[in-house]
A protein has these predicted regions:
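Histidine- and acidic-residue-rich, metal-dependent catalytic cores
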Residues: 1-198
């Protein structure tokens, strides 16, 4: 039996650092999305430590399929259209090259609106919720990046409630609203982004 000389955490860190080199706009994005998902999972108070760990790894590396600048241009827009390529490549990475084969659909569908995702019978409910948590955290991080200009951080919660139940599943929205991070999210998320790039 052969074991790697580094821990899972070190492998994730190595992959994240390499991924951050793809495009400067992605630096720290996965870490911030993972942090936001973590706050939602804490609010749910029903996940095992293994489930939390696995979902945080998926969240940190959710855009690992992105490597083309034109698609990254679309990914960093608030409204996501035509961003399937990176989701497909990320799905293939997780399905064929990691121990996350069963969770790979989370990456494939992390930009899929709830109205479409809920009708896909081949995907288990927990995987759909995980995809929605990453989707919501991803959009929130992009929103915070853009909101620097508009100074309207609190309007995101109203936005997602207005989109629900078409864009986001009600359970994900409820966890987002229950999560305890609004008071410090701006400072904490920016700090987290810096921590992974220094």
């Amino acid at each position: 039996h052969y074991t790697l000389p580094v821990s899972n955490k070190n492998i994730v860190e190595i992959v994240k650092r390499a991924f951050n080199m793809v495009d400067k706009r992605l630096i720290g994005h996965g870490s911030r999305v993972s942090y936001i998902v973590f706050q939602m999972l804490k609010a749910a108070d029903k996940y095992s430590s293994r489930e939390v760990r696995d979902l945080l790894i998926l969240a940190a590396l959710h855009d690992i399929g992105a490597y083309k600048t034109d698609e990254i241009d679309r990914m960093v827009e608030f409204e996501t259209n035509h961003v399937w390529n990176h989701s497909i490549y990320g799905y293939m990475f997780f399905k064929y090259f990691t121990p996350f084969e069963k969770s790979a659909p989370v990456i494939l569908f992390h930009h899929t609106p709830w109205e479409k995702l809920k009708g896909i019978d081949k995907i288990a409910g927990p995987l759909k919720l995980s995809a929605q948590l990453i989707n919501l955290a991803d959009r929130f991080d992009i929103y915070l990046e853009q909101a620097k200009e508009y100074r309207c951080y609190q309007t995101f919660s109203r936005y997602i409630e207005g989109c629900c139940p078409d864009r986001y599943c009600p359970e994900a929205v409820a966890l987002f609203n229950k999560a305890d991070f609004f008071f410090s999210v701006q400072g904490d998320i920016r700090r987290i982004g810096r921590d992974f790039t220094e």
